[in-house]
């Protein structure tokens, strides 16, 4: 009787200890469930340049997705997050990963000048050799919809993207259950990864989708 009165995903989470069941209110639950076969080993292709998408959060929290593109196919090869570091830390991290980079995408507020330095993070990053393209501010929900439409084109490296994927799977709306009202995304530990992912997807829809290679065109490894 109890199972009949509860949504199936809630019953599985609560009583069957299923961690694969969708989180109630999770924005990307269906899309990521359908993408399960595309969460695998997705190696870095040295013949393709790497793009990054960043969320530069408060208290120096940072989330970064790394991806390569062949036509409409998006290969999400890596994810990185940290906090308590300056931009110089991330400049070193980019270099240490050894990828050949093309474009770095950041949120619109990267252009805001900080009171302490009088410089924007856009300017500070440029001084460290990281030149950002600013992603248009289309609003959170439109960004979420852009992500939902883009996930079917994506492959994710299961190992390197595990933390980021865990965030995406649990990124959910804040709901007043008594009144049935949604207050938009719940701001928690999943937010920075999800925001950076939104910027990735918005950038894909706004920028030139052409494949950028090092010195020759590479066919899709999907076969």
Give the location of each predicted region:
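ATPase catalytic-site recognition across NTP-hydrolyzing enzymes
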Residues: 1-53
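Long, contiguous amphipathic alpha-helices that act as assembly "spine/axial" helices in icosahedral shell
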Residues: 11, 16, 55, 63, ...
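Short amphipathic alpha-helical "interface-anchor" segments enriched in bulky aromatics
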Residues: 15, 168-172, 197
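Short, flexible loop/turn elements at secondary-structure junctions
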Residues: 19, 56-58, 108
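Mg2+-dependent endonuclease catalytic cores in nucleic-acid-processing enzymes, primarily RNase H-like
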Residues: 22, 65-186, 207-208, 212-213, ...
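Acidic, Mg2+-coordinating catalytic module of metal-dependent nucleases/exonucleases
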Residues: 187-208
């Amino acid at each position: 009787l109890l199972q009949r009165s509860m949504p199936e995903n809630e019953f599985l989470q609560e009583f069957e200890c299923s961690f694969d069941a969708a989180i109630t209110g999770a924005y990307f639950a269906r899309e990521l469930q359908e993408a399960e076969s595309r969460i695998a080993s997705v190696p870095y292709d040295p013949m393709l340049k790497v793009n990054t998408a960043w969320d530069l959060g408060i208290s120096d929290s940072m989330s970064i997705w790394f991806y390569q593109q062949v036509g409409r196919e998006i290969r999400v090869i890596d994810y990185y997050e940290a906090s308590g570091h300056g931009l110089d830390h991330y400049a070193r991290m980019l270099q240490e990963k050894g990828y050949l980079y093309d474009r770095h995408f950041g949120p619109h507020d990267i252009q805001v000048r900080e009171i302490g330095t009088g410089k924007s993070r856009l300017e500070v990053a440029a001084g460290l050799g990281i030149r950002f393209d600013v992603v248009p501010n289309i609003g959170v929900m439109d960004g979420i919809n852009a992500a939902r439409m883009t996930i079917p084109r994506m492959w994710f490296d299961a190992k390197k993207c595990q933390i980021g994927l865990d965030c995406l799977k649990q990124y959910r709306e804040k709901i007043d259950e008594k009144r049935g009202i949604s207050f938009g995304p719940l701001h928690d530990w999943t937010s920075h990864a999800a925001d950076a992912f939104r910027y990735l997807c918005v950038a894909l829809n706004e920028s030139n989708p052409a494949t950028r290679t090092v010195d020759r065109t590479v066919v899709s490894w999907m076969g």
